[in-house]
């Protein structure tokens, strides 16, 4: 019965916290410290107006942050992410907004499979963005599920971008920057997938 949430902005955090309060089962809410006061460059989208006092966000309901229409002539992709990955994807897609649909999962369990599969079938290509090392990760598992369910709709393999597979985050800031994804790395992966 455990639920896992990972919001990308303060409004979602408030709604998920209230949902956790009313849920009879255990809930784990993860949050990225870089999103506090939007102090990391490129996270301006995390600054949102506080929702009403009664705002509750249901578990298992993803948010389409950037939507595209089905296109026959252009290559398109769906980016599935959560937390800080939402902001990397938004910043990475500034020059290709009409080709990139971005889905913020909000909750990792339960997961909104319906929204994911619908978007992937429309875009025909998928990139899963995470901050965790990709070996044996949630993102790899999700990519495998998408590949299995949406295989006949895909024009390319489902790709994953995450941290380098190292045992820990280095203390050296240069090494840390090298290890962790950012908007530039995500943009390069998007371009690679669009050209596939």
PLM regions and their residue ranges:
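Residue-level detector of structured alpha->beta connecting loops
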Residues: 1, 24-25, 97, 124
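Conserved thiamine diphosphate
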Residues: 1-23, 163, 194
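Non-catalytic, usually N-terminal nucleic-acid engagement modules in DNA/RNA processing proteins
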Residues: 29
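Thiamine diphosphate
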Residues: 33-196
């Amino acid at each position: 019965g455990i639920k896992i949430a990972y919001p990308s902005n303060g409004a979602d955090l408030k709604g998920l916290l209230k949902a956790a309060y009313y849920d009879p089962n255990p809930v784990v809410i993860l949050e990225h410290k870089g999103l506090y006061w939007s102090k990391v460059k490129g996270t301006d989208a995390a600054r949102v107006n506080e929702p009403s006092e009664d705002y509750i966000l249901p578990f298992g309901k993803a948010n389409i942050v950037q939507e595209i229409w089905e296109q026959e002539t252009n290559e398109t992709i769906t980016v599935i992410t959560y937390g800080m990955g939402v902001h990397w994807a938004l910043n990475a897609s500034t020059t290709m907004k009409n080709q990139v649909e971005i889905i913020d999962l909000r909750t990792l369990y339960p997961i909104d499979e319906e929204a994911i599969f619908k978007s992937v079938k429309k875009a025909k290509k998928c990139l899963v963005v995470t901050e965790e090392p990709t070996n044996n990760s949630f993102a790899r598992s999700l990519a495998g599920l998408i590949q299995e369910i949406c295989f006949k709709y895909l024009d390319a393999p489902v790709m994953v971008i995450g941290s380098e597979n190292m045992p820990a985050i280095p203390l050296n800031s240069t090494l840390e920057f090298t290890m962790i994804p950012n908007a530039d790395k995500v943009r390069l992966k998007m371009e690679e997938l669009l050209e596939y």
